UniProtKB/Swiss-Prot annotation:
SUPFAM superfamilies: Ankyrin repeat, E set domains. The lineage of its organism: Eukaryota, Fungi, Dikarya, Ascomycota, Saccharomycotina. This is Protein MGA2. It comes from the Eukaryota. The modification Phosphoserine is found at S255, S467. It is a single-pass membrane protein. ANK repeats lie at residues 719-748, 752-781. The gene is MGA2. One of its GO terms (molecular function) is lipid sensor activity. InterPro entries: Ankyrin_rpt, Ankyrin_rpt-contain_sf, Dendritic_Spine_Reg/Scaffold, Ig-like_fold, Ig_E-set, IPT_dom. It comes from Saccharomyces cerevisiae (strain ATCC 204508 / S288c) (Baker's yeast). Keywords: ANK repeat, Membrane, Phosphoprotein, Repeat, Transmembrane, Transmembrane helix.
Length: 1113
């Protein structure tokens, strides 16, 4: 201070203006210091000496004349001499001010800790409360579901939380008011917040709560807050994306250091955070009532947790011994990223809607017709004026009865009538008036009859176009203009529907046709029911998963959407006119009705949910399309492409590559099965070259069996569906069996939480359901819409109203829907839920699991153990052309389908002993045409057996016929030789090209036909690719040429490497290598070039030697 006072003294020779300027800067800094110190609440109780000390310290920070770094960016050197102004300042004023503020914040925190300890703690030395923590939080996870089971009425404390809005954002801070009421006096005076919900490091206690004394902990009420999904009560955790956003949000400070790292690094961090200190005193304390406020934020969006109904916050109050004293669950809150303007508009609309409901029918009638009826009694020749004064939004109901000269009334007249009406009625009618479509003067003609049609949009019924006259003439015009008026009528729909019936009764003498509308208008008593007007898109796949938008009116949160009998996978209400939902899977293709279920309807007196009935004239219809086979083939192609190239590619590119590689050899196949009229004695010798077409199930099954054990068969599509999901939906039991045996995961879930068991219950195949249950599948898993597999089965197969429709539309899956079938399928779940096995099964092996190794016949017998279930099994759909073979019993076909083709790829099987059973050799149902075998087996069997295109038979038959095998033919040893085969291949290839060219020429007029033919061609080539695959047993070239050559070369190398160096083998090897080098050099360089190269090398060697001799000497 002395130095500063000397500086303020005007010295001789100094400029008085500069001295005065610096004195003014000192006074400004002093005033700023006084404001900061006196404005802070922590210094109000201190002495003036403490303030003077802080003033001196801050003054020294601001004024440093001896060091030449004044905060005023001016330093004075050589007082009394020539004054020099130095503008090269190292530290700006803003950084100096920021450091002072940080210093003061630390001092405030220390002072607050000191004052808090002196006021609230009896022993400051032991229970000193210090805030600000740097150590990692080690918290214990608490399951909030344990508290939901406790009845709040039986707890000693009554907790109430208020101030939570319906919609908020992650950036908005919520100020919650908590009130705790008790019958007995409460001794606690402070609150303790959980460590998992503290947002900033400076709010944490520096020590753990366990380090404090017992008396201090008894004086605390422990509050816990958990965020759950509304309705489903599913627990939530902050997603990684939102955690990173919170880190960026905290790092926006000038220092650039995030102060929420403790919360971010905490494993048990919660979705709700508090901007309060971890321990703070209660503001309002009474004997039996405690009140305080919490500053809260919810830091994750509802859509990240698929909480369509929002979040609820569960508050619990415990004591220091972790005994539950009270709990409270808040109302749902939606955390969205909508702007505040949108939320305010929504709130305003809700207020307007509630004000409309308070208006009774008598009041609306009185306000509307208090003046208009008097005018009507004076002059009844003014129907146009009466129509507009009755209701400006229902003016179309009587426009068609106006004479032509009245229709041509100038339009400003009608606007003035509406303006007078709105001025007389101080209602909310003007809110929807700007949204009403205002016709132009040119549209008020016979062609522009759009405004004359009354589009009555009721909440119970879809759009109805009501015209009192000339309906047939205007129907086409209404359909053409309906698209433009739909959205406008949604917003500007009639606000008073009860007054419409009153207007009809008042105008019965004017138009007798209005009598027929009375009954219709009286049915529209409830204006709060939602209705669906349009579904976008109107069709989708049966496996679901696509986004579907519903357009309508009176939508709200909490509604459930059903497609037929299936609940939507997810539902999000965006506004009163828009709902976005995700399509659920269905068991069959066809049209279903889209309905809305309101479980929270106040007018519903029953306990069951109320479904909104849609009028028959315009129902919301959605069409399911079956394209699951295409998706199955695409996934199979991706698996093959991953095996071939090691990367995921588009399925079409993989198919084209396979077809391109296989097309030269594809012409070797003979005629297709469609051209064969029947078996002949010579077909056995031609079956190797017979073109065989397979169904999708058998084709994919062959692909899976051709893969090795390490192949990834659980590749999923964009929705998380694997081959097992789609095979269960299509009732491909043989493919399901192959996938499970190859190691497919039975508990995989897709993006909506659906497992393969869910899809099996949708299709309803009892054999697949039993197969999955035997594989220890988790049958209690719930999808994201809260349904288990058993509930999905009940929803799809027990609704009696839809059984007949399902039986008519299900062409590929024919089940017998009866009580016995349903009870037996439900008994499967009950038995596995009770932990019991099938007692009536012939399977006695304890290791009853398909994913483990066990005999094929054992598994087949276990599938067919229940006789009643076999009667309800579907007919096999594995053959493309079933007319060429005799239809067998469904049970036999299932037996064949489950054991088919276990031996054609036996080299890839895990357990080769399974193929040694003669009883396992059964007919193969995937072949579209059959050939009879003319030779008899040595065991005396005279049955005809079909063979595959590659000529492979069972392992048992191969062993029997091995002794009768002849020597290999020349064509077998050299299958790629030039000759007649090459000409035959070229001819067949040209025929295929000509046939494909002719097909393209015939289908040039239709793009759809071209696309279908291209897919059919790719499918045939894909079949031939897997058909022409040659087994190791028939590869004669490998056995008789390559293997002996490899053995010869290997023997030569061993004798050369480890034999005697003077042997003839070494001498011959050296000669061969020398001649090969010489021949290669002559070929590359030529004789003259080689001589020149050697001469240059020799000359270089001589020169180098001479130089070396000179260097040495």
């Amino acid at each position: 201070m002395q130095q500063n006072s000397e500086f303020l003294t005007e010295t001789p020779g100094s400029d008085p203006h500069i001295s005065q300027l610096h004195a003014n800067s000192v006074m400004e800094s002093q005033l700023l210091d006084d404001f900061l110190l006196n404005g802070s609440p922590m210094y109000q109780d201190d002495s003036m000496a403490h303030i003077n000390i802080d003033e001196g310290a801050n003054f020294q920070n601001f004024i440093k004349t001896d060091e030449g770094d004044s905060p005023n960016l001016l330093s004075f050197e050589g007082i009394g001499n020539n004054t020099h102004v130095n503008q090269n300042v190292s530290t700006p004023l803003e950084e100096e001010m920021e450091s002072n503020r940080a210093l003061k914040e630390e001092e405030e925190d220390e002072h607050e800790n000191k004052v808090f300890n002196e006021k609230n703690i009896g022993n400051p030395a032991h229970d000193e409360i210090v805030f600000g923590r740097k150590e990692t939080i080690q918290s214990v996870y608490i399951n909030p579901l344990d508290y939901l089971k406790v009845n709040a009425a039986q707890l000693p404390l009554d907790v109430e939380v208020s101030g939570l809005p319906q919609v908020s954002r992650v950036e908005n801070q919520l100020k919650l008011k908590v009130k705790i009421t008790s019958e007995t006096p409460l001794n606690q005076s402070m609150l303790y917040l959980p460590s998992d919900s503290i947002s900033r490091e400076k709010f944490y206690l520096k020590k753990n709560i366990e380090d404090f004394s017992e008396d201090f902990k008894k004086n605390l009420l422990y509050i816990n807050a958990f965020v759950l999904c509304a309705v489903s009560n599913r627990t939530t955790n902050v997603c990684t994306k939102c955690v990173k956003r919170e880190q960026r949000r905290a790092a926006r400070r000038k220092s650039g250091i995030a102060d929420n790292l403790l919360w971010c690094n905490n494993i048990n961090r919660r979705l709700v955070v508090f901007n309060n200190k971890q321990v703070f005193p209660i503001m309002k304390t009474f004997d039996n009532v405690k009140e305080f406020e919490l500053t809260t934020r919810l830091v994750c969006y509802c859509r990240h947790h698929k909480a369509n109904n929002g979040f609820v916050i569960l508050f619990t109050i415990t004591d220091w011994q972790n005994r539950l004293l009270g709990k409270f669950t808040t109302t749902p809150i939606m955390i969205t990223d909508r702007k505040p303007a949108n939320m305010d508009t929504t709130k305003f609309n809700n207020t307007t809607t509630s004000s409309r409901r308070q208006l009774t029918e008598e009041e609306s009638t009185t306000e509307y017709y208090s003046t208009d009826n008097n005018q009507l009694s004076k002059d009844e020749n003014m129907p146009f004026q009466y129509t507009y004064q009755h209701n400006p939004y229902d003016n179309d109901s009587q426009m068609n009865n106006i004479p032509l000269k009245d229709k041509n009334v100038p339009f400003p007249y009608s606007i003035s009538q509406q303006t007078d009406l709105l001025q007389n009625n101080n209602l909310s009618l003007n809110l929807s008036l700007p949204n009403q479509h205002i016709p132009s003067p040119t549209s008020m003609s016979e062609e522009g009859s759009e405004s004359f049609n009354y589009h009555h949009r009721d909440n119970d019924n879809p759009v109805r176009t009501i015209s009192l006259t000339n309906i047939e003439q205007q129907s086409q015009l209404n359909q053409r203009k309906r698209a433009r008026n739909n959205l406008e009528n949604d917003i500007g729909k009639p606000l008073f529907k009860h007054s419409f019936s009153n207007s009809i009764s008042a105008t019965n003498t004017m138009n007798p046709a209005l009598h027929s509308m009375q009954d219709f208008s009286m049915k529209n008593n409830n204006n709060n029911l939602p209705s669906i007007n349009r579904v976008i898109p109107s069709q989708g796949p049966i496996n679901g998963g696509i986004e579907v938008t519903l357009l309508g009116c009176n939508f709200k949160d909490g509604l459930s959407v059903k497609f037929g009998s299936n609940l939507a996978l997810s539902t999000q209400c965006w506004s009163e006119t828009t709902i976005v939902t995700y399509l659920p899977p269905a068991a069959y293709a066809g049209q279903v009705f889209v309905s809305i279920t309101d479980t929270n309807n106040e007018n519903n007196n029953d306990d069951l949910p109320q479904e909104i009935e849609i009028n028959d004239n315009k129902k919301a219809i959605f069409t399911y399309v079956d394209d699951t086979d295409r998706q199955l083939i695409e996934l199979a192609l991706q698996i093959v492409g991953l095996k071939m190239n090691g990367k995921l590619e588009d399925a079409r590119n993989i198919a084209k590559r396979i077809v391109g590689n296989d097309s030269p050899d594809s012409g070797t196949n003979g005629n297709s099965c469609s051209k064969s009229t029947g078996p002949s004695p010579n077909q056995h010798s031609m079956n190797l070259n017979t073109s065989v077409l397979y169904s999708d199930e058998v084709l994919i099954q062959k692909v899976i069996k051709s893969l090795n054990i390490n192949s990834n068969i659980s590749i999923c599509d964009s929705l998380g569906r694997t081959l097992l999901h789609l095979a269960c939906l299509k009732n491909y039991s043989s493919l399901v069996y192959t996938l499970i045996k190859k190691g497919a995961r039975v508990n995989d879930i897709d993006s909506f939480g659906l497992t393969p068991l869910h899809f099996a219950c949708i299709s309803g195949d009892p054999k697949i359901i039993k197969m999955l249950l035997n594989c220890k599948v988790n049958y209690s898993l719930r999808s994201h819409n809260g349904l288990t597999a058993r509930e999905v089965f009940i929803a799809n197969h027990i609704h009696s109203k839809e059984i007949d429709k399902k039986q008519d539309n299900r062409d590929n899956h024919k089940f017998v829907h009866n009580d016995t079938y349903i009870s037996e399928v439900l008994s499967l779940f009950e038995e596995f839920q009770n932990g019991t096995k099938f007692t009536d099964s012939v399977e006695t092996d304890s290791n009853y699991s398909i994913s483990r190794k066990y005999s094929q016949s054992s598994f087949n017998s276990s599938l067919l153990d229940n006789e009643s279930l076999n009667e309800n099994l579907f007919e096999s759909q594995s053959m493309i052309n079933p007319t060429s073979m005799e239809i067998q019993h469904p049970t036999l076909q299932l037996f064949e389908n489950s054991s088919y083709s276990e031996y054609d790829q036996s080299d890839f099987e895990e357990d080769g002993d399974e193929d040694l059973f003669v009883t396992d050799e059964v007919e193969k149902p995937g072949v579209a045409c059959r050939e009879e075998q003319s030779e008899l087996l040595d065991i005396g069997s005279s049955a005809n057996e079909p063979e595959e295109d590659n000529g492979s038979t069972s392992l048992w038959n191969r062993v029997l016929h091995r002794i009768n095998d002849d020597l290999p033919k020349y064509e077998d040893l050299f299958p790629l030789s030039w000759g007649k085969d090459d000409k035959l291949k070229t001819t067949n290839q040209d025929s295929i090209v000509e046939q494909s060219a002719s097909n393209i020429e015939n289908s040039e007029n239709s793009e759809e036909e071209d696309y279908e033919e291209e897919e059919e061609f790719l499918k045939k080539q894909f079949n031939r690719f897997f058909q022409n695959k040659q087994n190791f047993r028939n590869d004669k070239m490998l056995i008789f040429f390559w293997i002996p050559l490899t053995l010869l070369l290997l023997t030569w190398f061993i004798m050369y490497k480890f034999g005697n160096q003077d042997s003839s083998i070494n001498h011959i090897s050296e000669l061969i290598s020398e001649y090969l080098r010489i021949a290669l050099a002559k070929f590359l360089l030529g004789n003259e070039r080689m001589k020149t190269a050697f001469r240059s090398k020799l000359s270089n060697l001589q020169t180098t030697r001479m130089l070396n001799d000179l260097i040495v000497s």
